Amino acid sequence: MALIHHVCSAPFARAFGTRSLVAASSITHSHKHRNLSTATITTPSSSSSSSSSSSSSSRIQNNDSRVLLGLSEADLQQLAVEFGQKLIEGSNCIILFTKERSEMFRILVSVPQAFRKELQEAGWRVGRSPIYSSVTAADGTIKLLLKLEDNRLIETVGIPVQDEKGSMRLTACVSSQVGCPLRCSFCATGKGGFSRNLRPHEIVEQVLAIEETFKHRVTNVVFMGMGEPMLNMKSVLEAHRCLNKDIQIGQRMITISTVGVPNTIKRLASHKLQSTLAVSLHAPNQKLREAIVPSAKSYPLDAIMKDCKDYFLETSRRVSFEYALLAGVNDGVEHATELATLLHEWGRAYHVNLIPFNPIEGSEYKRPSKKAVSSFAAALESRKITVSVRQTRGLEANAACGQLRNKFQKSPLVLDSDNVQTESAVAVAC
């Protein structure tokens, strides 16, 4: 039975409490919610639909696929008014997901039937993609492969961590692009090529898919999946708004990562978000960084550091520097010493997150020894640099950072004849 889900709407997110798990009490649902067909409310167009459609504002018409997921409450209110409804109907716009063969189930919320019908006739739809494949690692990490409406595939990862009190923190690692154009030398994602930017709803739906798979609300979101978020900033910011305002994930629970794209850190700072900026540094000097990150040639290290300092001054939010440790390349104590000197030169509002390299097929890089990792961290700490070592998660699922690629990404377009993964094939960790 299809899961009935609401479009991002803050009043209803609050009304339902645990946002991803609740359906009306009179409706039962099975675990087959992960086998959703593309969520659509489209019905055959009639002559009346064109008039309803033409009344939409240019701002909403720019959403060429007419997707409701990710629209702000103000956009939904505007849409309701343009369809002759009251403002409140925009806020109350609960759109029904369809099951296979277009079977529909109604949730007990007062949305006028006429409004739903007009939306259907005008071609509006929810905007959810089916899960094409799912892999679960021994540590409970789950990688989902979502099939977009243009048959392209994106990956998102759910990372569960249980604290000492037994509470679970669930982090969704989301993609911002289909593939990545930057081709960092140690990263698997760039080897699969680049197709296009993701739309806002295609980012938001990744979080919803993780919630549905784990049957648990997502507590943290990191833009560290496929792609460079700063090259798709408009969609990332719109998705950020939806995740924060509508799905109610705190801004401080959201991290936006970048390898460094000129002028974009300044632009992000101007929005004064309270989210963490994570900069993929990977080297303590420009020469070594260019060897590891080819795109660094267009964005000198000093310029990045200045922009990071300005980001802190603008937002009062500490910057996190991601540093992938590559054995024999950038993992020596001398590199740690040089990194500490660099950071002290530009201020102290920084944190270094060390990431031992995750081996990928065809790469010449090696994972550093535990001793090398410990020595690097100790060298930073002795120089009063705040440091953490990222726990490697999901190696079996090829889901750890730098591993967002599998056999499907080598041929990113899925044939129409390919079947979406069935319920029985999906491994779920609760």
Spans of model-derived segments:
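Canonical Radical SAM [4Fe-4S] cluster-binding loop centered on the CxxxCxxC motif
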Residues: 162-202
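Conserved alpha-helical substructure of the radical SAM core
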Residues: 191-220
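Hydrophobic/aromatic residues in well-formed alpha-helices
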Residues: 76-79, 203, 236, 304
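Residue-level structural signal for beta-strand termini and adjacent loop
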Residues: 158-159, 235
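Auxiliary Fe-S-binding modules of radical SAM enzymes
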Residues: 2-154, 160, 168, 309-317, ...
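Conserved AdoMet/S-adenosylmethionine-binding subsite of the radical SAM
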Residues: 211-383, 388
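Short linear Ser/Thr-Pro motifs
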Residues: 134-137, 175-176, 257, 280
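Generic beta-strand structural signal
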Residues: 142, 154, 169-174, 182, ...
